C-alpha cells in the first residue's frame, strides 16, 4: 500500500509537466530532424518550455545580434534550486574569490551547454530543444544537484543564413547525392556571423556583439563544465573528449582526468547504440579563444563535441562508406552526449565544486606581474578588454621594474608611472592572465589546430615587462578633460592610434579639410611626427561655425588638439609647404564574394563599419568587369584566390586605373594575383635547394615530418621604415603575426616599409627551422609605385580576427596617406 501511494505521488508530480509540456515534434507539428527549425521558432519553443515549467526553467535574454535576433539562455534545475538561483550563483562566485562572501559547501554543479556557434553546423540547435525536453521529462533526479544552462544558438544570424538557404534550395524529399545543390552552400556560407567572423575564435578577443554579450553572462555564472557543440566532415563520425595534445600547462591534472571520465561515460552510450566515435585526436586545448579553451582557462571542464555533418549534410547525405547520415542521426548523437555529460556532473557535483575552487587559488607562476606602457588610447583599449573578462588591474607607483622585456626578448627594465598598467597573476583569474600575457606559451606538441602565439603586449603594441615579483599597484580614477578650442590659425592632432583615425574619419565625413605632414613639423618647440593631422581655418572657410564644429567632433572623440597661431613653423616645413598635404576623400571599393576569403572580407567590412565608421562600397567579384573605376580611388582586396576574377581584360582595366592614380591594397592571399606580372614588382621567396634530399619519410610520420616547414601563427620582429607614409604612427620596429610560410622577396623598385632582416627567430609561437631560414630578407609590408598610382602589399594580415590591434594603423595609413600626391574633390 505504501509503495502504491509513493508511485501515485510520483505520478502526480510528473503529470502536470507531461500534460503541459510539449515535445519539440508536438510543438512544431513535424518530427524533429525532418526539417531545419528557424531561430524565431527555436525561441518560441524555449518560451513554451519556460512558461510550462515556471518553477524549473528561467529564460534570460542576454542580447541581440547585428540582425536583431535574440540571444538567450535557459537555466534549468529543480524547483528548490531555481527558488535559490541567485544565492547559488553568488555562492559559486564567492567560493572562487570573484565576489566577497563566505565559502559554502554542497553547492549544485553548474553545466553550460553551448550550441551552434557555427551557423551551418545546424544539428546542435535542434538537439538543444530535445535536450531540455528530456531533462525535464526524464532526468529530474539529476536536476536536484545540477544546474544546466542551455544556450540554444550562439550564432543565430549565421544559422538562419544557412537554414533559409537550405529551405529554399532543398528537394522534397531530400536528395542524398552530394552532387545535389542542397549540399553545396554559396559564398559566404552559414558558418560565420553577420560580419562573417568565426565566433569560435572570438571568445578571448570579444570583437563581436554575440561574444561581448555572452561572456558577460558567462562570467556572471562561471560554470564548472562547458560543452561547445560542433559538426565536422561527413566521413568523421563523432568526436568527444578527452582532447588531443597540446594542452596548455595551466590545465590541471583534475581537468585532464575528468575529461577522460566524461569521455568514458559518453562512450558507454555510444557503444550501446553501436555508434562510431573518436577521442584524443585533432582538437587540442591551447589557443585561448575557443569555446573549449576559454572555459578551461576559467576553471571549467571545457570540451568540444563534433558530430559528422556540417553544412554539406543537409537533411540526409551518403558518406564515402555509402551510409546515409541524417539530421535525425546528428541531433540524436548530440542529445545523447549532452545528457551523458549532465549525468557526470550530477554524479560528481561535490568534487566538481571542490576542484573548481582550487583552480582559482593563487599559483606560484614565474611571472607574477605584467607591466605595460603605451599611449592612453592603447592602455584604455586593453583595460576595456580586461573588464569584459573580469580581470583586475591597476596603476604602479613611480619605480624601476626589471624583468623580461618584450621589445628585446631579453632581461631589461622600465621606469613606471601612474599612466602605466599592472596586471597581476595574484587574483582569482590569474590563470587567464598568464595565458593572455605570457611572452611565449609552452608548447608540448608543435602539431596544433590553430595559432601558437597571441601575447597581448605584442598584439596591442605595448612595451611590457614580465616581472618575477608582484608589483604593488593601485586604482586610478581618471577622466580626461578636453580643453575647449579657442579661435586660432589652425590645430594639430598627433597620429598614434586607431582613435586618431576615427577622429579623421569623422572630420572627413563632416567635409572638414585635413592636412598631414610627411616630415616632422615643429611648432612652438613641439615636434609633431609625420602623419599628424593639421586642420586650418583657412582650408575650411565654407564652414561658418568652424571652430565650434571642430570642437564638437574633438570632444566626441576625446582628442586634445594643439592650437597653432601661425603657419610659420620653428623650422621648415611651414604649414603651406608641399610636404604638408591635403588628405584625399577616400572612395573605397571593397571586394567580396567568390574568390575572396569570407573571413578576411568580414574583418575588413566590420573594421570599416563598426570601428573606423567610414563608408565603403562592397563590390561582388561577379560584377568586377562592370565596375566604373572612376568612382573610386582605393580598392581593398581581402585575402583570397583571384585567378577567375582577374582575367586578362579585368587585369588590363585594373592596371589602367592604377596607372591613373588608383591605389590597390592587397592583403595576404590577394597578393598572389600580382606575382605573375613583373610590372607589379612582386616575387615569391622560395626555399633554395642546394642538394636534393631523398624522400624517405614513413607514411605514419608524413604530417610530423613537415613541421620544420610550418609557421603556426608565430610572432616575429620586423624592421620598419617609419619615414614612409604607410608606417606613420609607428617606430622603427613592429611585431607581426605570421600565419604561414608564404614569403615575398624584398621589392627591387618599390618601398620595403616593414621587413624581416637576417638572423630572425620567433619571439613567440612555433616556426619550423626550415621555415625560419626562408624568412630572412622578406617583405612584410610594402608599396610598389605604378604610374601615378600604387599597389600596397600587406603580406601578414594586420586585421586577423580583429584582435591584432597594433596592425590596424597600417591599413589606415594605406588608405589615407600613401601616394597622396594630388588632392581630388
Enumerate the language-model features and the residues they cover.
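Bacterial Sec-dependent N-terminal signal peptides
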Residues: 1-27
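Short, solvent-exposed turn/loop segments enriched in Gly/Ser/Thr/Pro and often Arg
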Residues: 151-155, 166, 229-236, 670
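Aromatic- and acidic-residue-enriched segments that line the glycan-binding/catalytic groove
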Residues: 160-177
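Core alpha/beta catalytic barrel or barrel-like domain that forms the active/cofactor pocket
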Residues: 180-205, 226-242, 304-306
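Short, conserved secondary-structure transition motifs
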Residues: 148-162, 703, 712
